[in-house]
């Protein structure tokens, strides 16, 4: 079930290093999977079947995301088993760990809106949230220290902090997209907040929008789609802030 609240899974971008004579990794994935345009997907319904790759066009180019039941997206890399999430516009491959790397809180605190950010500014200093610090340490010990860093490229991770206030209740725009409209987006809104936004880095978390594209729907149980692994994990998408409690979207077990 896809909910808002508070274990996480790490994701990062894998660069294709195949020879130009051969098909690239991205081309092989496209050749072996059917594609469907995002305009033809009903995101108000969870996906319980093999839908293939959803194509989404953005100013950066076309991205592809696996949706629904997927049995051919397993990858072994850096001594870990991963699932392929999709293809980025630069043909790098987005992966997610099959099992969570750890169990921990996203943030030490949740009594301020800023704590929904992967990073936030305090006294003119950028502070890593709990989860960001762990991601950096995990990447160092698992990827860099084992000489896999050259295979990984930085990509954009969206921690959408854009929001509006209604009767003292702050709603993030992810709340509107995923609960009200059921219309996920991989375009990250610009923000002037002192937390969140777009982060260009080599490791991160999926957004709730990406979970929705994969086949999840807020408040609906789905034990069939490939992101379900029996664990609860965070996304980077804040949901709301009310009565001194900040909530993020999570994927429940």
Describe each model-derived feature in a short phrase:
Residues 1-23:
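C-terminal, structured domain-capping segment
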Residues 22-253:
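Long, domain-scale functional regions
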């Amino acid at each position: 079930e896809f909910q808002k609240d508070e274990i996480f899974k790490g994701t990062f971008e894998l660069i294709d290093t195949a020879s130009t004579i051969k098909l690239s990794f991205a081309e092989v994935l496209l050749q072996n999977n059917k594609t469907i345009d995002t305009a033809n997907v009903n995101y108000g319904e969870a996906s319980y079947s093999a839908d293939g790759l959803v194509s989404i066009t953005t100013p950066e180019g076309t991205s592809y995301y696996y949706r629904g039941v997927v049995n051919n997206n397993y990858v072994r890399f850096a001594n870990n088993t991963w699932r392929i999430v999709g293809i980025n516009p630069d043909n790098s491959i987005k992966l997610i760990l099959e099992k969570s790397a750890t169990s921990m809180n996203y943030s030490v605190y949740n009594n301020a809106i800023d704590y929904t950010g992967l990073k936030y500014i305090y006294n003119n200093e950028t502070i890593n949230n709990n989860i960001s610090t762990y991601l950096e340490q995990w990447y160092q010990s698992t990827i860099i220290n084992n000489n896999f860093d050259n295979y990984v490229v930085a990509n954009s991770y969206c921690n959408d902090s854009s929001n509006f206030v209604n009767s003292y209740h702050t709603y993030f725009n992810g709340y509107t997209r995923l609960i009200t409209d059921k219309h996920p987006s991989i375009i990250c809104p610009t923000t002037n907040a002192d937390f969140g936004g777009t982060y260009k880095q080599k490791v991160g978390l999926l957004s709730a929008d990406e979970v929705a594209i994969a086949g999840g729907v807020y408040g609906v149980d789905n034990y069939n789609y490939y992101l379900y692994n029996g664990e609860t994990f965070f996304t980077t998408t804040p949901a709301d802030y009310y009565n001194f409690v900040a909530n993020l979207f999570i994927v429940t077990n």
